[in-house]
Regions:
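Short, solvent-exposed loop/turn segments enriched in Ser/Thr/Gly
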Residues: 26-32, 84-87, 97-105, 149-153
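Surface-exposed loop/edge segments in extracytoplasmic proteins
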Residues: 178-188, 223-226
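Exposed aromatic-hydrophobic patches
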Residues: 32, 86-88, 198-206
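Surface-exposed binding patches on compact interaction domains or structured appendages
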Residues: 11-20, 39-88, 168-183
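Beta-sheet-dominated interaction scaffolds and their linkers
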Residues: 6-40, 139-154
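Short amphipathic, basic-aromatic surface patches that mediate peripheral association
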Residues: 159-163
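Short proline/glycine- and polar residue-rich coil/turn motifs
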Residues: 25, 77-85, 190-199
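Terminal connector regions
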Residues: 38, 42, 49-52, 61, ...
């Protein structure tokens, strides 16, 4: 009897990595981001760019506010290899700066290799939140709730405060009721809402339902019922 061992190929090493993937600059402070190129040496251009989340929570560069002028990244160009190098972020908010969180991205872009007919450039981003100390305003506007195709329930939430809001799993609960009885409880996946942004939370019912119903939305001390037609 002959045995054959099957080995899955190792996943390819990424061409460019950065750690940590999220940085908080609290007041006047500095933070270090380690950048490495596991596949070989790369020349990297460093910049700061607007950062936003779309309605479904997917990150994108652009569309948000620019990085504050009092935040800097150094160096602006560096050569990195497998051992890596460090980019230093520094924040120095001026006196009178408006309190709150300011999200943006540290963008790392590889340069194309000279002599190749097609120059491939790789770009990755690190989320940076510059926090100005002072009065923190936490304000979420919840609703409306809309049904789609009998199985999808969409909840809109707006963050009108000045701080990033993180909705951990279990913090937000949607309970579907019919004739006062609980049909199902929905626990949306974790989400993050940037200041002055809007999010659409989509949850799927375990089965197709039709007719009138009520959705009870619970988020911390907030509890409200919304009529719904499936």
């Amino acid at each position: 009897m002959t045995g054959i061992a099957l080995y899955a190929p190792a996943p390819p090493r990424p061409a460019l990595v950065a750690s940590p993937g999220r940085v908080v600059l609290d007041g006047t402070t500095k933070a270090l981001v380690h950048v490495a190129a596991p596949r070989g040496h790369q020349v990297i251009d460093v910049s700061l760019a607007p950062y936003a989340l779309d309605l479904r929570g997917r990150p994108r560069l652009g569309g948000g506010a620019h990085a504050p002028r009092w935040v800097s990244a150094r160096p602006l160009h560096l050569r990195v290899g497998p051992a890596g190098a460090v980019v230093t972020l520094a924040a120095a908010p001026p006196r009178g700066a408006v309190p709150g969180d300011r999200p943006f991205a540290l963008v790392l872009t590889t340069r194309g290799v000279r002599g190749k007919s097609v120059a491939v450039r790789l770009r990755i981003g690190v989320l940076v939140i510059a926090h100005v100390r002072g009065k923190v305003v936490r304000r979420l506007v919840i609703g409306p709730v809309v049904a789609r195709s009998g199985r999808l329930v969409e909840l809109t939430i707006r963050n009108t405060g000045n701080a990033v809001e993180r909705l951990a799993r279990g913090r937000l609960v949607l309970t579907l009721l019919r004739r006062g009885r609980v049909v199902v409880r929905l626990h949306p996946p974790p989400r993050e809402l940037l200041p002055r942004s809007r999010a659409v939370i989509v949850t799927r019912l375990p089965r197709s339902l039709h007719g009138p119903a009520t959705v009870r939305v619970s988020l911390g001390s907030f509890v409200h019922r919304y009529p719904l037609r499936l």
